[in-house]
């Protein structure tokens, strides 16, 4: 390869004027052998300009991630897709570790991503030598090679970070070499607090964290080595950050390597305590370790963390993530007596001076509110910000302490009450007090000591602050209303005030963060309080208009959810404004989708998705208003068109759901045109979305069968889609859906003249059965299509089976089909599939012109049917049982709980006692019961796609089968004897039960029909109702 030519092309990609020509040059060269190793040589060369090296690194990363592994050709194609040649791969393996060690940071980032992809595909099979190579550089006398080799080791460990313990053996073998090595290295580095030394220490900590985050490899750490590691973590957490760092701007300090190193050490100890060191909260393989951890390390580490919190209390700087992880660790310690004893004397100071301080409104909050209120909203509602926030961690610690340790809540409430009742207190502290009380709302509403005081608290301390001249206090007050929205109000006026103030804040407040909090509070009050819902009925239109305005301005997903919930609460009122609302939402969606930053901002995708869900909710609400639905259809079709035109595949699922909602009752000509458009999209890039298309396709078949059959193109489209799925590599779930659609078409069109389709459908599914099928669900679904064809027209199916010639199967396939069906009768699950199988077998046994294949399995037919009936009986019984259990659980849901642990007791002791008192039934048994329910219920996604056989007045499988047997008995006694001969006594008893039930069902159906013909049920007044009178006073007679 000509290196200079590649260098010039890479240089051209940086220049906008030359970019297209340069990219074309590279695209013509990348498949040439030695191209990828040439890129690596350019990357590591000090003689090449840095921007070119960086461009080469990005290009190589893209090549490796896309073209490294060997790939098979698509089904039906002989040409193998391109991948990097093995000679080139070996050259890269031989040199990439050195490349990472020698490269500057910005290039090194790209190369480590290459290495991760290579390790993922090649280790250990194709590249066991990577371990020796990393180890060689780790042991080097030159410290310059340590960081690069540690980064390589990190990629190795990260590759296995989320794998199950049994899949990590190659990593465990490697870490038997590396773990002692990096422990020794970090011990040597600890006394040196220079930038480079601490950078190396941080990287070692990151390796350890990735190793233990999801599984602790006990075979790598014994008590002695773990003690050394814990001492390392304790030392790093406890050591002083160089004082010169205080000269750096506070916003930049968390990124300093000394604070990051502390953060990772804390991250590790918090994770070890939470996942492996808390007895009573670990899986059985960690029982022994958890006891050892709690007794040996927990208190010592906590001592250091209490010191950190004291530093924060003394106004010394502590990085936010360090503070957050300290709170997380202490949160685990609250429930264990050994750590609680140490924490208990300090908990009041921690609560009042540290947690409270963190939960107050701060200078940085005020700065963001004033400079960019929309960014303030985004930050406050960002779940990822929450995850890393010291405020959230402080809130969680306080909540746990208040819930588990009885002395905490009264003292904290007294502290907050003092602040709220003193008019001279700093308003920011009032915000903190409200924040604390709102965070504890769930506990306060269950404690008899406090719950009756909460209404007075809202009246005296929250309602007035909703009118404060400080925006942040108004927002916090709305947040508190939200937190206490389930409160049982004794004074109706207070409830009315709460709702009116929330509405006023939503509609009239000028500050957007207040409006957002008010929206959430108002919706929560309406959902939890029946009277609140009534109060707001006259104001639905202005409320909805304001919510739409907020969404348009802020693009906040939480407010989109509020709109959805409000639509459900006020379905009748929303109907009158549905068109305007949908138009507004469509405009917001279009604006979001076409904004310049849409591609880069994930929040916008979530919010746009929320808008589509909201429009779908509106469609559901107005489904009975045909004239409104017709107007909404045009708006929705514009949205669907926009998404399809821009190929925004992440919204395909949502627009298909919209189309489904628009076709649930009738299908307009425009929606039939959409079928053709979707077919074109399906051909291009919607192949994997077939399962999402299925509900819509089902509607096309079942809602407007006349139009479906009026144009042969419609059925052709549906068949072609099913064929593409069943002949491609969409996966067996999609294939099951395709087979189901074919079955639905056959059953829906029985007697409607689709005879010409039956051979095509049957051949397609039986051909699929000749290729490898992994799941019984796909096997039975393919069989079910043929069974549906048997129900449609028995002679047509048998004729089709005789004519079909399958590859590698000489002669007709009737015998194979019948045998496969008989072998798989126990695989038909759920109600519909069993019913279909019973009807099919009943037709089979009643055939007059029976193929020899049926005679050959005569002894299996009736036993198989009886087995299927037994399965149906279990499904019905289990459904009734589950319904009863659901009602029972609902009744228990409102019981008050007391989870406090008496002063210094261990939570695990309390848990053990509770389990013993629960009739000896532990969690494992309960989980097994849940599994059993799922297994017997056998509900699948396919059960939801109804057919005419699933209607209440459809063919009854019990009557169908017994009638078939009676017919055979009277017509062909010899065949009847052959069918009955193999039955055991138990099976004959079961058969009699089926006969009895069939007769009962026939009698019930006839009685029901007779009543319907007479105009419905009439109830005679027998005096029963008059016996129940809840309004009268009993007499003394």
UniProtKB/Swiss-Prot annotation:
Disulfide bonds: none
Name assigned to this protein: Importin-8
Family, as annotated: Belongs to the importin beta family.
Keywords on record: Aortic aneurysm, Cytoplasm, Disease variant, Nucleus, Phosphoprotein, Protein transport, Transport
GO biological process: protein import into nucleus; signal transduction
Major localization listed first in the record, in broad terms: cytoplasm
Connected disease: VISS syndrome: An autosomal recessive disease characterized by early-onset thoracic aortic aneurysm, aneurysm and tortuosity of other arteries, motor developmental delay, connective tissue findings such as joint hypermobility, skin laxity and hernias, and craniofacial dysmorphic features. Immune dysregulation has been reported in some patients.
Region annotation Disordered: where it falls in the sequence: 886-934
Quaternary structure and partners: Forms a heterodimer with KPNB1. Interacts with SRP19. Interacts with RPL23A. Binds directly to nuclear pore complexes. Interacts with LRPPRC; the interaction occurs when LRPPRC is in its RNA-free form and promotes import of LRPPRC to the nucleus to allow for EIF4E-mediated export of mRNAS from the nucleus to the cytoplasm.
Biased composition (Basic and acidic residues): 886-895
A single cellular component GO annotation: nucleoplasm
InterPro entries assigned to the protein according to its UniProt record, in alphabetical order: ARM-like (IPR011989), ARM-type_fold (IPR016024), Importin-beta_N (IPR001494), XPO2_central (IPR013713)
Pfam families, per the entry: Cse1, IBN_N
Amino acid composition bias (Polar residues), ranges on this chain: 909-920
GO MF annotation, one: small GTPase binding
Function: Involved in nuclear protein import, either by acting as autonomous nuclear transport receptor or as an adapter-like protein in association with the importin-beta subunit KPNB1. Acting autonomously, may serve as receptor for nuclear localization signals (NLS) and promote translocation of import substrates through the nuclear pore complex (NPC) by an energy requiring, Ran-dependent mechanism. At the nucleoplasmic side of the NPC, Ran binds to importin, the importin/substrate complex dissociates and importin is re-exported from the nucleus to the cytoplasm where GTP hydrolysis releases Ran.
Record flagged with keyword Cytoplasm: yes
Organism expressing this protein natively: Homo sapiens
Importin N-terminal domain residues: 22-102
């Amino acid at each position: 390869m000509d290196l200079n030519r590649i260098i010039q092309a890479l240089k051209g990609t940086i220049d906008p004027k030359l970019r297209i020509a340069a990219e074309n040059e590279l695209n013509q060269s990348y498949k040439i052998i030695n191209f990828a190793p040439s890129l690596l040589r350019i990357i590591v060369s000090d003689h090449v300009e840095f921007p070119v090296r960086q461009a080469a690194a990005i290009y190589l990363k893209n090549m490796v991630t896309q073209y490294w592994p060997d790939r098979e050709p698509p089904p039906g194609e002989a040409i193998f897709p391109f991948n990097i040649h093995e000679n080139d791969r070996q050259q890269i393996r031989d040199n990439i570790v050195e490349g990472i060690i020698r490269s500057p940071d910005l290039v090194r980032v790209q190369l480590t991503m290459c290495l991760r992809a290579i390790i993922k595909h090649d280790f250990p099979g194709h590249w066991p030598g990577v371990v020796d190579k990393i180890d060689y550089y780790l042991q080097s006398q030159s410290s310059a090679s340590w960081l690069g080799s540690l980064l390589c080791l990190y990629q190795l460990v990260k590759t296995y970070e989320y794998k199950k313990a049994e899949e990590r053996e190659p990593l465990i073998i490697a870490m038997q070499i590396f773990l002692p090595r990096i422990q020794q290295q970090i011990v040597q580095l600890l006394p040196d607090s220079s930038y480079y030394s601490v950078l190396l220490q941080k990287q070692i900590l990151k390796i350890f964290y990735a190793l233990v985050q999801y599984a602790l490899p006990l075979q790598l750490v014994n008590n002695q080595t773990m003690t050394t590691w814990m001492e390392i973590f304790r030392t790093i957490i406890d050591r002083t950050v160089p004082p010169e760092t205080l000269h750096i701007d506070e916003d930049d300090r968390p990124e300093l390597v000394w604070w990051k190193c502390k953060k990772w050490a804390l991250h590790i100890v918090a994770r070890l305590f939470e996942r492996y060191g808390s007895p009573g909260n670990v899986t059985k393989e960690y029982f022994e370790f958890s006891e050892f951890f709690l007794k040996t390390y927990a208190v010592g580490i906590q001592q250091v963390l209490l010191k950190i919190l004291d530093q924060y209390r003394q106004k010394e700087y502590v990085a936010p993530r360090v503070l957050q992880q300290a709170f997380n660790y202490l949160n685990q310690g609250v429930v264990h007596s050994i750590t609680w004893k140490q924490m208990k004397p300090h908990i009041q100071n921690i609560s009042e001076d540290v947690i409270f301080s963190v939960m107050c409104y701060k200078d940085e909050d005020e700065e963001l509110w004033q400079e960019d209120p929309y960014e303030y909203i985004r930050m406050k509602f960002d779940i990822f910000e929450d995850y890393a926030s010291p405020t959230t961690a402080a809130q969680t610690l306080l909540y746990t302490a208040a819930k588990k340790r009885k002395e905490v809540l009264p003292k904290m409430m007294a502290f907050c009450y003092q602040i709220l009742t003193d008019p001279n207190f700093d308003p920011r502290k009032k915000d903190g007090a409200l924040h604390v009380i709102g965070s504890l709302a769930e506990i306060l509403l269950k404690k008899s000591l406090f719950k009756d005081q909460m209404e007075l608290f809202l009246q005296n301390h929250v309602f007035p602050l909703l009118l404060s001249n400080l925006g942040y206090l108004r927002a916090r007050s709305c947040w508190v209303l939200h937190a206490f929205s389930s409160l049982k109000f004794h004074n109706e006026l207070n409830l009315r005030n709460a709702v009116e103030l929330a509405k006023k804040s939503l509609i009239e407040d000028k500050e957007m963060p207040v409006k957002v909090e008010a929206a959430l509070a108002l919706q929560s009050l309406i959902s939890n309080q029946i009277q609140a819902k009534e109060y707001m009925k006259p104001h639905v239109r202005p409320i909805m208009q304001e919510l739409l305005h907020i969404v348009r301005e802020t693009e906040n997903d939480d407010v989109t959810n509020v709109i959805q919930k409000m639509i459900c609460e006020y379905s009748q009122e929303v109907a009158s404004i549905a068109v305007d609302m949908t138009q507004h939402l469509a405009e917001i969606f279009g604006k979001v989708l076409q904004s310049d930053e849409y591609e880069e901002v994930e929040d916008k995708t979530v919010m746009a998705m929320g808008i589509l869900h909201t429009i779908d909710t509106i469609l559901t609400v107005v489904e009975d208003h045909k004239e409104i639905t017709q107007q909404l259809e045009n708006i929705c079709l514009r949205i669907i068109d926009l998404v399809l035109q821009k190929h925004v595949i992440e919204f395909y699922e949502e627009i298909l759901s919209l189309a489904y909602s628009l076709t649930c009752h009738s299908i307009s000509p425009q929606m039939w045109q959409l079928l053709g458009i979707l077919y074109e999209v399906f051909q291009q890039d919607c192949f994997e979305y077939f399962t999402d298309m299925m509900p819509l396709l089902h509607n096309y078949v079942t809602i407007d069968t006349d139009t479906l059959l009026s144009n042969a193109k419609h059925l052709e489209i549906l068949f072609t889609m099913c064929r593409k799925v069943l002949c491609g590599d969409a996966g067996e779930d999609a294939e099951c859906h395709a087979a189901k659609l074919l079955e639905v078409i056959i059953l829906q069109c029985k007697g409607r003249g689709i005879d010409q389709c039956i051979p095509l459908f049957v051949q397609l599914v039986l051909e699929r059965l000749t290729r490898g099928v992994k799941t019984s669900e796909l096997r039975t679904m393919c069989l079910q299509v043929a069974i549906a064809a048997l129900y449609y027209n028995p002679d047509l199916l048998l004729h089709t089976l005789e004519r079909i010639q399958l590859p590698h199967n000489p002669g007709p396939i009737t015998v194979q089909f019948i045998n496969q069906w008989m072998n798989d009768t126990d695989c038909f699950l759920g109600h519909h599939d069993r019913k279909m199988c019973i009807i099919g077998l009943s037709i089979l046994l009643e055939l007059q012109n029976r193929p020899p294949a049926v005679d050959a399995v005569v002894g299996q037919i009736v036993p198989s049917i009886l087995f299927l009936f037994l399965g149906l009986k279990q499904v019905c019984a289990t459904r009734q049982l589950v319904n009863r259990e659901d009602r029972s659980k609902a009744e228990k849901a409102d019981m008050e709980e007391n989870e406090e642990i008496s002063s210094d007791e261990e939570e695990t002791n309390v848990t053990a006692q509770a389990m013993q008192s629960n009739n000896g039934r532990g969690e494992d048994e309960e989980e097994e019961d849940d599994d059993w329910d799922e297994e017997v219920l056998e509900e699948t996604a396919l059960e939801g796609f109804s057919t005419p056989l699933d209607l209440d007045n459809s063919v009854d499988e019990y009557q169908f089968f017994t009638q078939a047997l009676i017919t055979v008995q009277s017509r062909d006694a010899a065949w009847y004897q052959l069918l009955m001969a193999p039955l055991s006594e138990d099976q004959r008893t079961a058969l009699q039960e089926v006969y009895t039930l069939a007769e009962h069902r026939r009698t019930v159906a006839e009685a029901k029909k007779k009543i319907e013909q007479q105009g419905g049920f009439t109830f005679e007044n027998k005096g029963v109702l008059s016996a129940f009178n809840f309004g009268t006073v009993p007499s003394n007679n």
